């Protein structure tokens, strides 16, 4: 689950992570009132959406008067903001964050993410703050510092020293401040079951203070039961409607850009299926894991969600029955053909528990556009061929 910048900064405040003062607004009038409340002569008007690249997309603007705050708020609030992370459809801006200006001397990058290969959190930092960290990683990877932190010992002084030396910070007072900053950020990450925390930019001010000028946070959905205060921050309007609908039926769904719909049981098999489709020359339109409790209703709902995507030219159902029974999947496919206009070829590979019964169910139904596959490679090849033929 992701949250907005203004919410991330509320959490920063609880942990003593320094940020500029700011207030959220849902109207132009409220934005101007917030600027008056904050005081000063310079404010930053920020679009609040769940995506990075807001500044380059025109969603972060500097205002030097209350009139300018009003003008910029009118421009940004209600706009469809397109960034490199939103896709071409963009996101509707429904909230603003009005923040006091900061005396920026230097921009850095600081984040904490989970390194799945090392199986531990990693602190990432760079002197290239304010830029897309993906671009820095691609073009100049040597400018990114990565410090693995073993959860068994937590953030220690030697981690902090590696951080400040790596960033070239030599002033003892500044070193102490940044080490304290990073220590608080790591504590926040661990105590809240975060998956990712990113501050870009982390700025050093003219007085040598460090401030989180931005804040992105993502949390482990499976751990939200331990953090009701964070779950209350969920903004459903920022989430994909199909993903939310799938979740109601116990389906894990992620929309992608390809043209072959995928329905698989198990995340590992789902990723392997998508890799095989790519290897065969196709592109997956989605990730859809029906899980171990799939029945006819959930399978039918999966078809309905997949077919909402007009790009889908074929569907590949790849089930290896262990907990989930293949005959239930077969009945779900039949149910889907009754409830939904399944107008594309459906390639079906069923193996494992009750696979023979499932094959008989589909064979007896004799549905013209349901095509049997013998294994993963055969199914992927047939799906790619069917999608190509439908173009």
UniProtKB/Swiss-Prot annotation:
Biological pathway: Carbohydrate metabolism; tricarboxylic acid cycle; succinate from succinyl-CoA (ligase route): step 1/1
Cofactor note as given: Binds 1 Mg(2+) ion per subunit.
Cofactor(s) needed: Mg(2+)
Listed GO biological process terms: succinyl-CoA metabolic process; tricarboxylic acid cycle
One annotated GO molecular function: succinate-CoA ligase (GDP-forming) activity
EC numbers: 6.2.1.5
Catalytic activity from the UniProt record: succinate + ATP + CoA = succinyl-CoA + ADP + phosphate; GTP + succinate + CoA = succinyl-CoA + GDP + phosphate
Residues that, per the record, bind substrate: 265, 322-324
Its job: Succinyl-CoA synthetase functions in the citric acid cycle (TCA), coupling the hydrolysis of succinyl-CoA to the synthesis of either ATP or GTP and thus represents the only step of substrate-level phosphorylation in the TCA. The beta subunit provides nucleotide specificity of the enzyme and binds the substrate succinate, while the binding sites for coenzyme A and phosphate are found in the alpha subunit.
Quaternary structure note: Heterotetramer of two alpha and two beta subunits.
UniProt family annotation: Belongs to the succinate/malate CoA ligase beta subunit family.
Official protein name in the record: Succinate--CoA ligase [ADP-forming] subunit beta
Organism listed in the record: Sulfurimonas denitrificans (strain ATCC 33889 / DSM 1251) (Thiomicrospira denitrificans (strain ATCC 33889 / DSM 1251))
Underlying gene: sucC
């Amino acid at each position: 689950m992701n949250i907005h910048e203004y919410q991330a900064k509320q959490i920063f405040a609880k942990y003593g992570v320094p940020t500029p003062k700011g207030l959220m607004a849902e109207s132009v009038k409220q934005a101007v009132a917030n600027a008056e409340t904050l005081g000063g002569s310079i404010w930053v008007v920020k679009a609040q959406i769940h995506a990075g690249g807001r500044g380059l997309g025109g969603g972060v603007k500097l205002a030097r008067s209350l009139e300018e705050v009003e003008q910029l708020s009118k421009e940004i609030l209600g706009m469809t903001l397109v960034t490199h992370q939103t896709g071409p459809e963009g996101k509707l801006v429904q909230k603003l964050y009005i923040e006091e200006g900061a005396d920026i001397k230097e921009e850095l990058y600081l984040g904490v993410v989970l390194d799945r290969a090392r199986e531990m959190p990693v602190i990432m930092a760079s002197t290239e703050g304010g830029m897309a960290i993906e671009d820095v990683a691609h073009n100049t990877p040597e400018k990114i510092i990565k410090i693995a932190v073993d959860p068994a010992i937590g953030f220690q002084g030697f981690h902090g020293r590696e951080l400040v030396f790596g960033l070239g910070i030599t002033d003892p007072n500044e070193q102490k401040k940044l080490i304290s900053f990073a220590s608080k950020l790591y504590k926040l990450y661990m105590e809240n079951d975060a998956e990712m925390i990113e501050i870009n930019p982390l700025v050093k001010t003219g007085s040598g203070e460090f401030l989180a000028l931005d804040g992105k946070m993502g949390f482990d959905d499976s751990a939200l039961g331990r953090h009701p205060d964070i779950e209350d921050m969920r903004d459903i309007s920022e989430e994909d409607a199909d993903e939310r609908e799938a979740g109601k039926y116990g389906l894990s769904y992620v929309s992608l850009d390809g043209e072959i719909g995928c329905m698989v049981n198990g995340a590992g098999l789902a990723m392997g299926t998508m890799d095989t489709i790519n290897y065969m020359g196709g592109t997956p339109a989605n990730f859809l894991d029906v899980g171990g409790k799939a029945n006819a209703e959930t399978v039918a709902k999966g078809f309905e969600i997949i077919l909402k995507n007009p790009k889908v030219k074929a569907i590949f159902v790849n089930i290896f029955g262990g907990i989930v029974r293949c005959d239930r999947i077969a009945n779900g496919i039949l149910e889907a053909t009754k409830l939904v206009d399944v107008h594309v070829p459906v390639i079906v590979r069923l193996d494992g528990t009750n696979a023979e019964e499932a094959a008989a169910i589909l064979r007896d139904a004799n549905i013209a556009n349901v095509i049997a596959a013998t294994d993963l490679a055969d199914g992927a090849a047939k799906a790619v061929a069917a999608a190509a033929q439908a173009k």
